[in-house]
């Protein structure tokens, strides 16, 4: 029987990371609703959109894996492209159909992004506890490869915080694609999503072994992306309700006649 590799886990760090990552959706939602008048329903739809997208992706990946085999090089392109394709298509469908009545308000894009990124952070925060309870199994499966120090958990928590901003940014991209009937922003969202995930793939496959370098790159990239999407958001205009606008115009004309 092979001896399980000894790996150190900083339990206080894991618990703090769990608390921080799990609370992000509540913190962002509170700020969005309290200070910017965002809608809770949109945040919930964003979370459900993420869950449905990942669920469908998992089913398709499972079928492909059965066809080609777990370790086949043929499934790599699917692992690299499906996350962006499914999640951004989920965003597109939600904005186009489910949230059609709320698309007049550009804040819908932010609220949806909070739900999407927040629920992902919540689920990852919960899964962080597995490092404590099933440590040996994760080591044997190759999921836990190195010491889980306090600094490591801190950077992981920070990366989750930054990832929420990435999801908000991508939501702005897809929202703009719907609002302006410009498909290139939807395609760009898919490409950006898969580009970010590609670096996680490099670490998982031991192509890049320095996790700190990957995390720092993602943080740096997220700052640039957030700045660009903020400019897109600012330039979006809230559409007025057509009925209200018609009534207002009619009222103004009526006053002029009098």
Feature annotation, model-predicted:
Residues 1-258:
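Hydrophobic alpha-helical segments at protein termini of multi-pass membrane proteins
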């Amino acid at each position: 029987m092979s001896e399980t590799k000894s790996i150190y886990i900083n339990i206080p760090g894991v618990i703090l990371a769990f608390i921080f990552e799990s609370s992000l959706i509540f913190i962002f939602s509170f700020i969005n609703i309290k200070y910017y008048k965002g809608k809770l329903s949109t945040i919930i739809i964003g979370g459900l959109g993420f869950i449905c997208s990942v669920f469908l992706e998992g089913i398709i990946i499972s079928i492909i894996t059965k066809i080609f085999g777990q370790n086949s090089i043929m499934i790599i392109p699917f692992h690299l492209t499906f996350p962006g394709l499914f999640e951004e298509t989920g965003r597109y469908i939600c904005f186009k159909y489910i949230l059609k009545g709320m698309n007049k308000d550009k804040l819908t894009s932010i609220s949806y992004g909070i739900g999407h990124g927040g629920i992902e952070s919540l689920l990852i925060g919960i899964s962080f506890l597995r490092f404590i309870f099933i440590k040996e199994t994760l080591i044997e499966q190759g999921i836990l490869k190195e010491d889980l120090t306090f600094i490591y958990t801190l950077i992981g928590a920070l990366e989750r915080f930054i990832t929420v901003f990435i999801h908000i940014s991508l939501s702005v991209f897809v929202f703009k694609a719907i609002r302006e009937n410009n498909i290139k922003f939807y395609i760009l969202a898919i490409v950006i999503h898969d580009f970010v995930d590609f670096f996680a793939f490099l670490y998982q496959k031991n192509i890049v072994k320095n996790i700190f370098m990957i995390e720092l790159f993602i943080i740096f990239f997220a700052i640039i992306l957030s700045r660009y999407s903020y400019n897109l958001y600012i330039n979006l205009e809230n559409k007025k309700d057509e009925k209200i606008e018609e009534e207002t115009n009619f009222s103004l004309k009526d006053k002029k006649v009098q």
